[in-house]
Every structure is written in structure tokens, then in C-alpha cells.
Regions:
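Alpha/beta enzyme core
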Residues: 1-108, 116-136, 140-148, 169
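Glycine-rich anion-binding loops and their surrounding alpha/beta cores
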Residues: 112
Length: 187
């Protein structure tokens, strides 16, 4: 069992204070805590972070943050983005920053906003009415490289949402007579 706390919208000191409090409570119950340092651009849970407001994780702050909070895993910002429209060109991740952080902290690193937007899922979505033709995600090669450099957990929520959306849209097109949500969700 684990908790993910994203205090990245707070100041560095406030993020430490809040994360430390959550870690203390969670650890009483043997629950691990993933914390976030650095702001990832894009839209997540109806919260939008503009590219200009996103900032990459500072390796020196990562050291201080992990030591001060006692978090069990650290989600870092190295250039990924939340949502389906991450990039207009190829994904550009700061692998040097990732390597530096991995070398100086002793907790697993997490990559948020790492969905790849697979073309196979994108095609099903667009074939059945979803308007995501310009969606572009993190490349498989970039994710593989991040893992070789120290990332131990990769979050791909947008890919899961798109796969769900594709399946539902396809089912409803092929079986328009079905109106029971329980039947739809069984597929």
C-alpha cells in the first residue's frame, strides 16, 4: 500500500513541511510515500500547469528533500508532460539531470507524465470519433533510457485513459443496442 503526495505546487520549504508530515503519518501504518519535486507541465486532475510555470527538479534540492522528508520514492520533473498533447516534435527529456539525481538520492525515482500515446490506440480512438490526431507522447526509447538511468516507476495514465476510451467507443459503435453501463464496462 502506498500514498502519492504532490506538493510541487507549494514552495520548496512548504513542500518539505507537508511531505514530512504525510510521511510521518503514513509510516506509522507501514505505508510508503511517493513525493513529487519539480512541476510537470500539462493537465492532470483538472489542474493545468503551463510550460512557463513548469520547472525541472534541481538535483541539490532533491538531496535535501529526500533527507528532510524521509519519502520512499521521488517523482521528478525532467521534461515529461501530463496529458495527450505533450510535444509538437520529439520528446526531449533532461537525461543528464536524471543521471545526476539518481546518483545523489537513495530512493526509487518516478517519472510522471510518461505516456507514449501508442499509434495503435490513437488510431482506434480516432477511427471511432475521438479528436486526438495531434496527440504525441514520450517515445519508448526515451522511457527505456530513463529506466537505465535510474527511474523505477513510470506513470502512463493518459495511455490507460486512451485505451479505455478506444474500447468503449469501439464497443458502442459495434453494439449500439447496449445501453446498460454494466454491460459496456464488462467488455
Amino acid at each position: 500500500t502506498s500514498v502519492m503526495f504532490d506538493g510541487s505546487s507549494f514552495s520548496f520549504k512548504e513542500n518539505i513541511r507537508r511531505t514530512k508530515k504525510i510521511v510521518a503519518l503514513a509510516h506509522k501504518y507501514h505505508v510508503s510515500v511517493e513525493a513529487e519535486l519539480g512541476a510537470i507541465a500539462g493537465i492532470e486532475d483538472f489542474v493545468s500547469v503551463a510550460d512557463r510555470d513548469a520547472h525541472l527538479t534541481d538535483p541539490k534540492q532533491a538531496i535535501e528533500f529526500v533527507r528532510a522528508t524521509g519519502c520512499d520514492a521521488l517523482a521528478i520533473a525532467i521534461g515529461t508532460k501530463h496529458g495527450a498533447y505533450k510535444y509538437t516534435g520529439d520528446s526531449i527529456l533532461d537525461f543528464g539531470r536524471l543521471k545526476e539525481i539518481a546518483e545523489c538520492v537513495d530512493v526509487p525515482l518516478v517519472l510522471h507524465g510518461a505516456s507514449g500515446i501508442p499509434s495503435s490506440i490513437k488510431k482506434i480512438c480516432t477511427d471511432y470519433g475521438c479528436e486526438i490526431s495531434n496527440a504525441k507522447g514520450v517515445s519508448d526509447a526515451a522511457v527505456r533510457k530513463a529506466v537505465t538511468l535510474g527511474v523505477r516507476k513510470v506513470n502512463v495514465d493518459t495511455d490507460l485513459r486512451l485505451a479505455f476510451d478506444a474500447g468503449i467507443r469501439k464497443f458502442l459503435k459495434e453494439r449500439p443496442e447496449v445501453i446498460d453501463p454494466r454491460e459496456i464496462l464488462k467488455t
